[in-house]
Amino acid sequence: MALFEIIISLFVVYIIHNAISKYKKIHVNELCGPTPIPILGNLHQFGELPHRVLTKMTKKYGHILRVYMADMYTVVVSDPLLIREMYVDNSDIFTDRVKKPSVEHGTFYHGTVTSYGEHWKNNREIVGKAMRKTNLKHIYELLDKQVDVLIRSMKSIETSGKTFDTRYYITKFTMSAMFKFLFNHDIPEDEDINKGDTQKLMGPMSEVFQNAGRGSLFDVINITQPLYLLYLEMFDQSFKDIMKYHREKYNEHLKTFDPDVERDLLDILIKEYGTDNDDKILSILATINDFFLAGVDTSSTALESMVLMLTNYPEIQEKAFDEIKTVVNGRSKVNLSDRQSTPYLVAVIKETLRYKPMSPFGLPRSSSKDCMIGGHFIPKNAQILINYQALGMNEEYYENPEQFDPSRFLKVESNVAFLPFSIGIRSCVGQSFAQDELYICISNILLNFKLKSIDGKKIDETEEYGLTLKTKNRFNVTLEKRII
């Protein structure tokens, strides 16, 4: 009985201490936000679509606000000028990633995405150099080949009278492009990505995305973090399987590695990092993992959204097709060199990324010290999130933001609020590759097919919350061959 009373007393003391830490005033210019509760903070208010709840909160608290994700003081920002002030003007303060068990377990803070401090600076320099050394002609040929495979599959589906499983084939396209870019590996055209060799990687990667999308309360409660890390190390197999797969590819490359012949990004990383200690090898493996986790699902989400919006807005689809048809002038394929001649299609891509962001918040950053941003106090170790939904719906920068209207991007050369790949020195390192991938894929789909919903009605655009914002319900579309 005495032990039970002690436990209850300690719990009560913890609750009181936790509440005081959240309620106390930290600065005269501290951020406003909803009232938190002990332990949970504001998590109980987020619902199924936290990014939309936080977007609604901007009406009351403005485009920079404070919430508590359990014990984690979090700054949510959707004002592009404040984002620039943080990530560009004060990049030395807002470069680091957030430290928590799920990140440490999966990456050991190596690679380019989750590392921080001097380790990140070194990785960024090496990976940046590796990306610059990547042969552009090789990338163009790589993407062209993968588009050819996709279009052949779509033609076969159209001829058979079946419907097009958007998520499956788009994911296979982005995954095949990444396999070729990283490993110089061709996924067989008839291979089911849910089976065979690719499933060894895609299976555990799907689990990682599902788990990360759901999140864990223990990841953001200070007192439980050490135990949660131990739990992950003991029982979570997904990241171990992923790293095992990457190590197998790494070992295969070492057997045939020639420093004078750079076959893919892995070869370049081996050459740039070296292989003389375990830390360098881990950085190589973590970087490869970064490209897969950050590149495959985000690009497939964006392309799936483009198919969705073009199907739901046939008049926009026809206008984009007419532009493409005029530019190719009888050719059977759109090339990357056609991009400058297709401003409306580029506007469609941009509008889709604004209207249907790839990710709710991108990758969180952390403040390395107390600072003032836009007259607001940001404490040390605050988690920083960009709310891309609220950013894209910010009425100060977008007229009638609830409307899907690509022409808004034709009226001005650029919009300071358009930041789908973030901004500053820690923006997406694969941005150029992703932009090429999105353009070459959707342009050739439009050139070859008219996209229609199966029942003639609009497809449900509701998204499902996760690391990326895919549609809640998978959808197929009907393909109608274009006459060009």
UniProtKB/Swiss-Prot annotation:
Membrane-spanning segments: 1-21
Keywords noted in UniProt: Heme, Iron, Membrane, Metal-binding, Monooxygenase, Oxidoreductase, Transmembrane, Transmembrane helix
Membrane topology: Single-pass membrane protein
Family named by the database record: Belongs to the cytochrome P450 family.
Subcellular location: Membrane
Enzyme Commission designation: 1.14.-.-
Cysteine-cysteine disulfides: none
Alphabetized GO MF terms: heme binding; iron ion binding; monooxygenase activity; oxidoreductase activity, acting on paired donors, with incorporation or reduction of molecular oxygen
Protein name: Probable cytochrome P450 508A1
Taxonomic lineage from the root: Eukaryota, Amoebozoa, Evosea, Eumycetozoa, Dictyostelia
InterPro entries, A to Z: Cyt_P450, Cyt_P450_CS, Cyt_P450_E_grp-I, Cyt_P450_sf
PANTHER family, alphabetized: STEROID 17-ALPHA-HYDROXYLASE/17,20 LYASE (PTHR24289), STEROID 17-ALPHA-HYDROXYLASE_17,20 LYASE (PTHR24289:SF1)
Record: residues binding heme: 428
GO cellular component: membrane
Names of the cofactor(s): heme
PROSITE patterns linked: CYTOCHROME_P450 (PS00086)
SUPFAM superfamilies tied to this protein: Cytochrome P450
